[in-house]
Amino acid sequence: MDLQLAGKKALVTGSYRGTGRMIALALAAEGAHVGVHGFEREAAEAVAREIHEQGGAAVALEGDILTDDGAKQLLRETQDALGDADILVNNYGTADAGSWMKSETPDWIDAYQKNVLSAVRITRGLMEGMKAKGWGRIINLGTIGSTEPAARMPHYYAAKGAMATMTISLAKELESTGVTVNLVSPGLIRTKEVEERFIARGKKKGWGETWEEVEPHVLKEFMGNLTGHVPRPEEIADVVVFVASPRAGAINALNIRVDGGTTALVT
């Protein structure tokens, strides 16, 4: 299937590593010109080079989107390198450890800054250009914790819950403009960091020393699903790329859970 993304211009925040990197690679593989964002240019340049080596088009962009000035820098660099963006993937966010009694007021504010305002700044900077063109895609990266939050990390789940409601509000704001807004919500993702963390835990618990040995225990004791494997970053990226494409014009104001069936709910 041709996703009709050739020549589309996409900015992916936090695409210097992890799932964001895979989203940038996948968009470029479909012909999009990708802005790879990092808080430090060197990290973004490494991913941009990787895209170039695979025959794709990419440019490294820098900006501390946790500040207004840093977000303005990223928006300026995006405009200079790409022109008006067609696609924005608000991928950046962090899940810092905490609990109801250990997470203090600054932790809650920090979670909102990282997971909500970072996206708001860039969204507000790009949405008018999309409206003017009559076409655009804004995709926010959420979490299944917005649907079924855990007791741990309440500050993080509260912030991601705000991103979920923000997505619907923005979709209504952009009604009939040709710009769609959706939320893609993964559960546990098999990133390099997740593999390393659970392999280390598995060695202590006697589960084994490889991911193949440890994964069944992760699914049983930490976060199970109906597929029998922990979703890979590539699987999240594939969904994001489809939603970003012209083929997905009827998908709007939706929370798409990509968790292998961890949250097996009718909603």
Residue spans of the language-model regions?
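Short C-terminal tail/terminal secondary-structure segment
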Residues: G18, E148, V240-V241, N252-T267
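Residue(s) in the substrate-gating loop at a strand-loop-helix junction
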Residues: T143
